[in-house]
From Swiss-Prot:
Pfam family, one: tRNA_Me_trans
Provenance organism: Rhizorhabdus wittichii (strain DSM 6014 / CCUG 31198 / JCM 15750 / NBRC 105917 / EY 4224 / RW1) (Sphingomonas wittichii)
Protein name per the record: tRNA-specific 2-thiouridylase MnmA
Name of the top EC class for this enzyme: transferase
Gene Ontology molecular-function annotations: ATP binding; tRNA binding; tRNA-uridine 2-sulfurtransferase activity
Reaction(s) this enzyme catalyzes, per UniProt: S-sulfanyl-L-cysteinyl-[protein] + uridine(34) in tRNA + AH2 + ATP = 2-thiouridine(34) in tRNA + L-cysteinyl-[protein] + A + AMP + diphosphate + H(+)
Amino acid sequence: MGAPMNPEFQLEGRAPGSLAGARIVVAMSGGVDSSVVAALAAASGAETIGVTLQLYDHGAAVGRTGSCCAGQDIRDARAVADRLGIAHYVFDYESRFRDSVIADFADEYAAGRTPIPCVRCNQGVKFTDLFGIARDLGADCLATGHYVRRVVGAGGRAELHRAADPARDQSYFLFATTRDQLDYLRFPLGAMPKPRVREIAAELGLGVAAKPDSQDICFVPDGDYASIVKRLRPEAAEEGEIVGLDGRVLGRHRGLIHFTVGQRRGIEIGGSPEPLYVVRLEPETKRLVVGPRRALAVSAAMLDDVNWIGEGYEGPLTAKVRSLAKPVPARFEDGAVRFDQPEYGVAPGQAAVLYAGDRVLGGGWIRATVPAELAVAA
């Protein structure tokens, strides 16, 4: 059974369903999602080329699967390409990935912020370097396995929308995608539930049909991100004081890299009449400031490096400050997100992404927060 036709590959200037002579480059990670995208592209009638970036290979080192773009993943991608009868190329981007993603990850933690390396990777390696490769190969578009939707708006420009399957939506991680990139990108899985994607892979006899999903941070073995940061920025692992909101020393911590704003676990301080949470990190003094939950309330988040793809929109919007958080009503004014109601656990280094319904309007990196005026005892 062949792969179904997918309208996502429609190209401007071509009649619907007419892709003869077109060329599509597919970003293939070796997982089931990108493999099905390659199958859908091949079924469209366009010449399809699979491209895999060798980014980081710790899979062999930790003896398990689930690490993105590792050696086994490259072999899986090549096997899928062979079965589909499409060309497949591998490019070594380990050095670039190390410098632009891993080093930035360590720097952010050392500065007391909470980074999102997947956004940095999409922003740089995947949607900049991979774009260059696709254009050099003469592709009419670049297709990926992200669960988001590309919708052509009333003005004829592409918009970024949430995936149809909310449990799989990855729009938060793609807020930095530019207008020009959206014009070139295709996301064939945005309207599909994940079980259907696996069904297509099984129907086509792809060996990755039952392959587990990759972990979120591909270069962090077993989720121990602190060991990565400690190796690259050892000063971030130095012990320091735990202090209350009034500056009173309450105890010692084993390194700021083990904490993020809003965290409760691991503080290990007894005698407090109410639970204590991380309110902020002060890397200059190595102090961990803790307080009650109400001390986490913020009224606004100041953003850096804002990417806005909501030109012309002036209606109500919502903001999302963590990948798994629910969007909340907010306003966007002068580079700041101002929440209608106090928001909790907003960490510098994270992203604030703005939505109008399902449409992504843009977002930016949280530089600082403005405390809500709630009564907080010292």
